[in-house]
């Protein structure tokens, strides 16, 4: 089994300007100085967290999906983040998971943020996504999903190794973001990555970043704090396997069945 090099981008976003965001993010990704396996972008990285889906949504054949395919091929890495997608007359806050060969899978955000009225605009997802990538099993989720531990619960029969969240999580609730991200790593005996944005959106919401990568013990491997930038770290396969072999909490949990 191999190690996994993970890169994530913490950045401000241009409000409702997908072309500007793709261009700015593309420039930042071009600064990668080492090979990486996985590149993670924030939630709604083309628009900011918006309820104006009719004017901002793209289709799966639109420019953002094409751009993700270009970036994945250029960096020989999976590139992921969420965007506003229209499909069959419905709108989704859709995490797009794009491999270097152009193949694509996706996860639609399950828990919609009722405080912002997200449920009135978007359709919730019905299933989790767990992807096998270069020897690691990865479960990508979106923002508000972080507050619901049953949805991220690891399965001892086929555990994921890395749990990741892409987010537009406001600074006013940053304590919850940091606390829950750490809890998700510890309770699932898995590495955890949370990728948030910084700056202020057009609605006046401030974002403090606090993107972080943690190991399965809940120890910080990378903390971005409020800094803009592209962060890279290599997760060690043997460290995760050794810890799980010694600390078998996944096998001691209660049996359950998850239904969407």
Range-by-range predicted roles:
Residues 232-260:
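Short, basic/aromatic-enriched C-terminal tail that caps enzymatic domains
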Residues 81-83, 94-97, 129, 211-213, ...:
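Short beta-strand scaffold segments in enzyme catalytic cores
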Residues 20-29, 147-153:
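Short, acidic/polar
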Residues 12, 45, 84-85, 112, ...:
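Catalytic metal-binding/acid-base residues of hydrolase active sites
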Residues 19, 26-105, 170-183, 190:
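Cys-nucleophile CN-hydrolase/nitrilase-fold catalytic domain and related Cys-dependent amidase chemistry
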Residues 63-78, 147-230:
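CN hydrolase (nitrilase-like) catalytic-core segments centered on the catalytic cysteine
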Residues 3-13, 17, 94, 137-145, ...:
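Active-site-proximal beta-strand elements of phosphoester/diester hydrolases
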Residues 86-158, 172-179, 244-249, 259:
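Active-site catalytic loop in hydrolytic enzyme cores
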């Amino acid at each position: 089994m191999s190690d996994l090099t993970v890169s994530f981008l913490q950045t401000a976003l241009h409000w409702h300007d997908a072309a500007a965001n793709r261009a700015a993010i593309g420039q930042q990704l071009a600064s990668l100085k080492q090979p990486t396996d996985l590149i993670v972008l924030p939630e709604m990285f083309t628009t900011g967290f918006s309820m104006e889906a009719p004017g901002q949504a793209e289709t799966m054949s639109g420019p953002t999906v094409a751009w993700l395919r270009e970036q994945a091929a250029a960096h020989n890495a999976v590139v992921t983040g969420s965007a506003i997608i229209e499909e069959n007359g419905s709108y989704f806050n859709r995490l797009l998971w794009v491999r270097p060969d152009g193949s694509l899978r996706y996860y639609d955000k399950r828990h919609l943020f009722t405080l912002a009225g997200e449920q009135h605009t978007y359709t919730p997802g019905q299933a989790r996504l767990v992807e096998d990538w270069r020897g690691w099993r990865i479960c990508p989720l979106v923002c508000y999903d972080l507050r619901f531990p049953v949805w991220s619960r690891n399965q001892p029969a086929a555990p994921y190794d890395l749990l990741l969240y892409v987010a537009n999580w406001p600074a006013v609730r940053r304590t919850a973001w940091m606390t829950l991200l750490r809890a998700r790593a510890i309770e699932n005996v898995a590495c955890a990555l949370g990728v948030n944005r910084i700056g202020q959106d057009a609605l006046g919401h401030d974002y403090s970043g606090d993107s972080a990568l943690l190991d399965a013990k809940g120890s910080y491997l990378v903390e971005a704090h409020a800094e803009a930038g592209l962060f890279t770290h290599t997760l060690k396969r043997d460290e995760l396997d050794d810890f799980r072999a010694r600390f078998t909490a996944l096998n001691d949990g209660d049996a359950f069945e998850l239904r969407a």
